[in-house]
A protein has these predicted regions:
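Class I S-adenosyl-L-methionine
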Residues: 1-10, 15-112, 120
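Short secondary-structure transition/capping segments
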Residues: 45-47, 64-65, 122-126, 142-143, ...
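A contiguous loop/helix-start segment that scaffolds small-molecule binding in enzyme catalytic cores
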Residues: 2-7, 76-81, 137, 146-189
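Short phosphate-engaging motifs
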Residues: 25, 117, 171
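Short, solvent-exposed amphipathic alpha-helical segments in soluble enzyme
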Residues: 21-25, 47-50, 98-101, 127, ...
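Short hydrophobic/aromatic-enriched beta-strand-loop microsegments
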Residues: 49-55, 106-110, 129-136, 183-189
Length: 189
């Protein structure tokens, strides 16, 4: 009998920003497969198998295809699996790739959304990502790509709305320079 996999977003890091549904599912799982960005407080006291796939920038202790294999194998063993991810599973969390792996094996799954840092960080700093008469649209862009040209800086530089770059701390100067190269005002906040 196949188990079920829950792709669970742990939110932006503060322990009180994870959803009640996520906490309920965590309390019932047989296996939790977690990333570095998910707080240890969410799983350290659980009475279940814990698998650290500790991904961080520039160092993947476990490759994505291996993570896919782990969650598939555990589900095929009949286990209830939580794939615990920082932020939201589908905002640069590679949750889409994990869903494809589950679908290929006809494994039931459910996504439990998490609060993405793309929204929460500006809000916690008192900055609304959208604001009537100032920014009517919001673009969430990766700040870390294998191939820089995957990001259309020319189009982004022309946008009047809010640009949020995730995972871009190491590339912030390059990102800003590319946007200004295509016409973004250097005084843009």
């Amino acid at each position: 009998m196949k188990g079920k996999v829950y792709l669970v977003g742990a939110g932006p890091g503060a322990n009180d920003l994870i959803s009640l549904r996520a906490l309920n599912i965590l309390g019932k799982c047989d296996t939790v497969v977690y990333d570095r960005l998910a707080s240890e407080d969410f799983y350290k006291d659980l009475n279940c198998e814990k698998i650290d796939v500790g991904k961080k920038v520039g160092h993947h202790s476990v490759k994505q295809n291996e993570i896919n294999e782990i969650i598939v194998q555990k589900a095929l063993e009949g286990k209830t699996v939580v794939r615990l991810k920082g932020g939201d599973p589908f905002i640069f969390g590679r949750g889409g790739e994990e869903v494809i792996a589950l679908q290929e094996h006809n494994i039931p799954y459910e996504v439990i959304p998490g609060i993405t840092s793309a929204i929460s960080v500006p809000e916690l700093a008192g900055i609304p990502p959208t604001h009537r008469k100032i920014s009517q649209d919001l673009h969430i862009v990766t700040g870390h790509t294998a191939e820089e040209e995957n990001v259309n800086y020319k189009a982004l530089a022309q946008e009047k709305g809010t640009l949020v770059f995730l995972m871009g701390v190491g590339n912030i100067e390059k990102i800003a320079n590319r946007l200004m190269e295509f016409g973004k005002d250097e005084n843009t906040p």
